Amino acid sequence: MLPLQVQAESHVPLYVQIRDQLRAMVHTGELRPGDRIPASRELAHSLGVHRTTVANAYAELESEGLIQGHVGRGTFIRNAAEAALPHGTNGTNGGSNGARGFTPAPPTIGNGTLRWESLFADERGEEALSRIYPEGANGAISLVAARPAEEHFPLEELRSCVQAVLKTSGGEILQLGSSDGYEPLKRELIAQLGKEGLRVKSEQLLVTAGVQQSLDLLCKAFLRPGDAVVLEDPTYPGSMTVFTTARVRCLGVPVRTGTNGQAGPAGIDLEGVEAALTQNRVKFVLVTPDWQNPTGATMPVESRRRLLELAARHQVAVVEDCIYSRLRFTGQRLPSLRQLDRNNIVIQIDSFSKIAFPGLRVGWCIAPENVIERLRLVKQATDLHTDQLAQATLAEFTRRGGLDRHLKKMRRVYAERAEALMKALAKHMPEGTEWTRPEGGMCVWVTLPAGYDASELLIHAREKGVLFAPGRYFYVQAPKPNVFRLGFASLDEKRIARGVEILGNVLREEMRKRERGGWRRSDSRVALV
């Protein structure tokens, strides 16, 4: 393993410390052309940092031409001649064999069994929570996911909508469609947005396969390896996966939750945003202003205005994830960043996944017309268009008023479940435990007393039939071991109360063990399966 060291207490970001040490080792000859450096996951484990931190360092070094990832082989130090050449050349011709600056290894002759792992691009990508903690496994009470309550899906109404679409459109709806999106759905979305105070033209709206695809399209349209984006920290793991897979540097800025005596308004730390924009060439800032995932924090209006001012001054785009915005239980809905935008710098992404049916995979993106045109071309190259039948069904469902009725009902259901969670936490969690109290969304962020490890707690909670999501999966930079997320939307009040009761009992037992000297901290980097 490389002789690298990082200092967590330093004012220098961890990824910069790693980058600078590797760069120095190249210049001093400690690392020579052709040397293989550790995979990002391997080095992160060795240094005790998040894999994204190492990925950010590697992305910068790759953009400088000092290292190069190679399909099936790993990441290597480039020689000086290769570093001076544009990516995609090998100094002799423009052929694809030299596209990554290496002479391809000859094919290995084996026993006839193909080793698929040798063909993978590399080891990028975190294991999804849904794979590590399958929903309802062994009858467990799963507080892992932030997903809708399927027992309240209006199946009969949805079935009627599908039948109406097939009767009206026949086989035409099963043909290829427009990359822009199904026009009747776009009209319904524009009408819905208009009722919420946001005026949008058809040319400013692109139908996608959900927020995850919207992020992927933005990544492909705007970002190159080594480019930087600002993310909330902690954040939605899917966004990190999109960007780290593309070798984009993720700059995490802390999110204030109002717990642990934090000063300042809730939401992303604006001083941290300003510092990131001042010290880096950032392409865009990604934020979830309403009930941020995983913390449940909501940005006040004044903070939203200030974020837009910062972005405009630094000429940086803002990507606004509104996936939870319609799930407010109480009070008035706050204006979106897009509504407050006076400089045409906001790209808004949204989806039916939290407000209706996640399995249909339909979302949308709102942006300036020239941005939408670019995204449309990228989408066309990616998947041609979003599922036509799903779009048409949702258009009919919305036209009939089904979406409004469903939302009204689900806000009430989720409010009751959130209240049940608040009461259960207050009743069963030991002193010193804190949690957020969102007025909307689907999740709550819990902070254990200092010194306790949520991953250790999960091992024992799982044995008792309760699952939750440790905070380490959500961090861009150094994970905090004593935090975790609880998703409440998909469980009824009885199971929520029972799950938290078990969780509280497990935590109290761990506290008693600690007092007796039997408590043991686990390595929070170990995947729990």
Regions found by a protein language model. Give the residues of each.
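N-terminal basic, amphipathic alpha-helical segments
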Residues: 1-163, 376, 380-387, 395-398, ...
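PLP-dependent aminotransferase class I/II
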Residues: 345-427, 434-438
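AMP-binding (ANL) adenylation modules
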Residues: 474-479
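Conserved core of the PLP fold type I
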Residues: 161-314, 325-343, 414, 494, ...
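Hydrophobic residues in well-ordered beta-strands that form the structural core
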Residues: 231, 252, 318-320, 394, ...
